[in-house]
Amino acid sequence: IVLKGKYGPLSVQTKVRNGKNAFEYKIWKSKGKKHNKYDIKKLEIKNFNGFGGFDKEGKEYVIKLTEGVNTPVPWCNVISNQKFGFLITESGASTTWAENSRENRLTTWSNDPVIDPSGEIIYMRDEETGEIWSVTPHPIRTKTPYIVRHGFGYSVFEHNWNGIEHELTEFVPVSDTVKLCILKLRNGSNTKMKLSAIYYARTVLGVYEQGTVQHVYTELHSNGAILARNNYNTDFPGRIVFLDTNAKERYYTGDRREFLGNIGGLKHPEALRKDKLSNTLGAGFDPCMCLQTVIELKPREQTEVVFMLGQGESLEAVSAYSERYRNVKRVYKALDEAKAFWEDVLRKVTVLTPDENMNILLNGWLLYQTLSCRIWARTAFYQSGGAFGFRDQLQDAMAVIDVLPDIARKQILLHASHQFIEGDVQHWWHPGSNKGIRTRFSDDLLWLPYVTVNYIKRTGDVQILEERVEFLEDEPLKDIKAHRKPWL
């Protein structure tokens, strides 16, 4: 309950809450429906290991999940551009960030390899029977198979259930700070279908939800998008997170308790037992961003619903993203551009060995992971650090000198600017705030000259030696002997 002084006595406000805003469980017209049986399409997979393998071109890793089958651990794709990205596993569990994958998470991150919980879920609901399921294997797994395809800069989930053929494609544009989700739905049954598609995101807007829950508040943009802010995140001030869709009919809530209920949980959200979300936003809630839209499909009819989750530095930036990506053609154009970007980068160097498996890894996947996961995202399922490591990202930069020399050059100069005037360096630091640690790790000092020499040899760019950057200044580290003395 959110109480405001201007609305009068407590007794009046609680009556309003229990009257105007209360909504009853919906009574569904029928219970149960015969589900169409689908045969999983034949897949040409190389090196199939019982769970998945590469497609015939080696450009996608394809995972096949049938009833009762799970990968040994979460198998994920780290998808990013230079300022924004998300991690998604084969179950559909996902976390999204902007600018810093640890310090500025938009949604929750978890590295629990058993449960693999998600901060973002797309639910479906049959408006006739009330049955709910998720487009991805998590959190509501159905009996029919799932096909998951991790590609360069995108992931796709294919699934058929309840007469509906689903195809969900998730990606980030080449430069915009927004995650785009194309949900393609086709009615494969012989009857008209009315469905709800619901995007649920547990907001963080910081490092961990436990530390930001009391600071995040939600509101409605004049264009219908949901906005979330955290004015206490001083490292990323003024940022506005938004959730939007191309669909016109929409209902929403920013109250996680309303959506999940006291005993509902992700598998049985209480709000989905009711007709629609309550259109409640504001402060004082356990926050989330949840958006519901309703779709009607005739037999064999197909439609596309676009969900977008992103961040802008101003309301104008958010408005521009919403306007741009409510247009489905522009979304597909952005997808084509993202695929073309990775195709161009990854084909610049081709390696041919007698081992086909080695060729697949060397001609795409290793370089893709180095750039998307290591240099840009600096995150993974095991560890979500967000920081630049002085030696780590210099090592990574060596892998891209021949294909993206500008990125390697930028990385060298960035690390040069994190040297102290005494000659030691920041072992790691967070972009934005530049918070980090100062150490005496000696191997850090070796990597800057080593990588610079390699860069010059491979590019001929001796001008980099003429570049000037500033040193860091701070109180010098204490003498190591003085530091150790109390322990001797």
Language-model region placement:
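Aromatic-rich carbohydrate-recognition surfaces in CAZymes
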Residues: 123, 300, 400-408, 412-488
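Anionic coordination/interaction segments
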Residues: 1-394, 406-414, 418, 454-459
